[in-house]
Amino acid sequence: MFTGVQNYTQEVIKAAKYIGQGFTITLDHMNRLPVTIQYPYEKLIPSERFRGRIHFEFDKCIACEVCVRVCPINLPVVDWEFQKSIKKKQLKSYSIDFGVCIFCGNCVEYCPTNCLSMTEEYELSVYDRHELNYDHIALGRLPISSIKDPMVYGVNGLSYLEKNIIQDNTNKDTVTGPYNKE
C-alpha cells in the first residue's frame, strides 16, 4: 500500500512539474511588451524564414513539374511543349493562384534548379480573387524590400532581431505621406 501511495505522489509531482513548465512560458509571454504597429504607415519586417509570395525565374525552369507533384493541392500550372529539335521540354507558361496557395514552401524546397523562391511580400489583398492568379510574368517581378521601402518606419525592439539591424527610415526628405504634409 505504501508503494502505491508513493507512486501516486510521484505522478502528481511529475504532472505539477509539466503544468508549471507550461505556466512559466505563459507568464513569460505576459511580461512582454505589446508589439502593435500602425499597419499602413509602419510595416512589420518579416523574420528570416518568412514564407511570403513566391518569386519565379522563367529562364531557370526546366519544366520538370516537381513543384506540382510536391504541392499538397497540385497548385502550380506548368504549360510546356516538347521541342524535337533540341529534345527538351520548352516552358510556355507557369502560374500560381495565391487565393488557393497555402504557402507551405514545398515547391521552393524541392525545385531542382532553384527557379522558385519565397519573398518577404505579404500584402496580397485584392478586391477580386481572380487577380490572385499570377502568371510567370507577375511571378517574375521582385517586390520592393520592406527594409528599402521609404514608406516603412523601422520597428525597433523585436525579439528576433539583433541590435542595430533595423535603421530608422524616418528621414524627412524621403518619407512622404498624409502625415508629412508641409
Swiss-Prot record:
Disulfide bonds: none annotated. Binds 2 [4Fe-4S] clusters per subunit. GO terms for cellular component: chloroplast thylakoid membrane. It catalyses: a plastoquinone + NADH + (n+1) H(+)(in) = a plastoquinol + NAD(+) + n H(+)(out); a plastoquinone + NADPH + (n+1) H(+)(in) = a plastoquinol + NADP(+) + n H(+)(out). [4Fe-4S] cluster 2 binds at residues 71, 101, 104, 107. Its main location: plastid. Gene3D superfamilies: 3.30.70.3270. One of its GO terms (molecular function) is NADH dehydrogenase (ubiquinone) activity. It is an enzyme of class 7 (translocase). It is found in: Plastid, Chloroplast thylakoid membrane. NDH is composed of at least 16 different subunits, 5 of which are encoded in the nucleus. NDH shuttles electrons from NAD(P)H:plastoquinone, via FMN and iron-sulfur (Fe-S) centers, to quinones in the photosynthetic chain and possibly in a chloroplast respiratory chain. The immediate electron acceptor for the enzyme in this species is believed to be plastoquinone. Couples the redox reaction to proton translocation, and thus conserves the redox energy in a proton gradient. Belongs to the complex I 23 kDa subunit family. This is NAD(P)H-quinone oxidoreductase subunit I, chloroplastic. The gene is ndhI.
